[in-house]
Structures are given as structure tokens and as C-alpha cells.
Amino acid sequence: MLGSSSEIKAFYYYNLSANRNHSESQKNLGYCYEFGRGTEKNLEEAFKWYKKSADNGYKEVYDTLGNFYKLGKGTEINLEEAFKWYKKSAENGNNESFQNLALCYDIG
């Protein structure tokens, strides 16, 4: 399902902005792909855009990227990368990442 006409328009403009290297739009485009908002659900595309957003310094996506690596959503499971992104997110004060980082240390 593509969603409502406003979701399709939002996807269109997020896509334009994301392709011009706007990191928040890259995160939003990843969200659209992850949940099928304005486009077909595609976890590989979601991962790609979340990663671009993180690589461009958008701190709010670090924890999400850690989850994708941990669960193998749109990419191979990579616990070392998951830990790295959880740690970066926690260092930036993300409360959810403190929990995820604690679980990494607890489980090993």
C-alpha cells in the first residue's frame, strides 16, 4: 500500500531533499521505506537511507541504525556495528540507546 495522497507527496519531497544530501530528509525517507508510507515497504532502501543520514551526522537516527544491524533489517546482522551505533547514540544522550547499550553489555 502506498498510502494517502499526502503521504505520496511527502515521499516525493523527502526523496528530492534526501538526494540533495539533507540528513533529516534522508532519515524521513528511510522511515517511509521502512513502514511503506507513500511508497512500497522496502527494508533495504530504508537501511540505505538511514545509513546515509547517520553518515551525514543526523544523530537521531543512530539508534534506529543500531536496531537494523542488530535485527538484520535490510542488511546482514552485524552485532559489532549495532553496538557501535548504539554507543554513538548513547554518547549523544539518547535514552533508548542507554538501554540498548546495557543489553549489549549484559548479553555480551
Give, region by region, the residue ranges found by the protein language model.
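Short coil/turn and helix-start
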Residues: M1-I8, N19, Y33, R37-K41, ...
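Short, charged/polar low-complexity linear motifs in solvent-exposed/disordered segments
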Residues: N21, L43-E45, E80
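Ser/Thr/Pro-rich low-complexity tandem-repeat tracts
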Residues: S17, S23-S25, S53, S89, ...
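Hydrophobic face of amphipathic alpha-helices that form TPR/SEL1-like repeat modules
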Residues: M1-G3, Q26-F35, T39, Y62-L71, ...
